[in-house]
Amino acid sequence: MRWFPIAVAAAFPLLLALSGCGHLPGATSDVYPPPRPDQVLDFPALYNQNCQACHGTGGENGPAMDLANPEFQALIDDNRLRNIISNGLPGTQMPAWAQSAGGMLTDQQIDAIIAGMRKEWARPDVFAGVTPPPFQQPAGGNAQHGSQLYQAHCAMCHTGPARQQLISPVYLSLVSDDALRSIIVAGRPDIGQPDWRHDDAKGAPQMPLSGQDITDIVAYLGSLRNPSTVSAAPIPVPPRR
């Protein structure tokens, strides 16, 4: 039986290969490790990991702004979008994502997110022949006039539970004046909210809202905030692993 040890020794390399033990220390492999988190520049991967929870799958139907709305994409320029992503929005749940502000995204990754949103959701002709109202809320505004405009242009949809939710001090403490204005101007087609023209809103006057009208409506909604309501802290950015 002297041949038996020799046969086992000869068969040992084959057994290793068949058993999956071929990847021993120092062995070459066609399988590469995944990239480090700060090296990921793929837009779908970055969006799904960092944005989807608040802004929804595919940029819509989330609790935060509908990023897939072409009107929103047309109204906000790259610099403002970059500043919001990088530094967050104080008083809201939008956190700062830039590493320079305590977040976990590099400048290159933020640029990749912006470029990806533009490629996927922007439509350069969305406002062809139309001049939309200013996107940012100015100081001031006539809250009393805004209340009248709200009744004429908004109340037919925002009634009952919907109205209570919109004018809830808790909700209003979570959303900035600029965010309220952006929703009125750009609309939220994912949830049926029309834009400032509200030409698809049932029962609403068909005359578009002016920039001053929107300023006054936002001033009215802002007046309903409870000063004692604590503003929401930004959602914490998960630590880098």
Feature map (PLM): residue ranges:
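Bacterial N-terminal signal peptides that target proteins for export
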Residues: 1-10
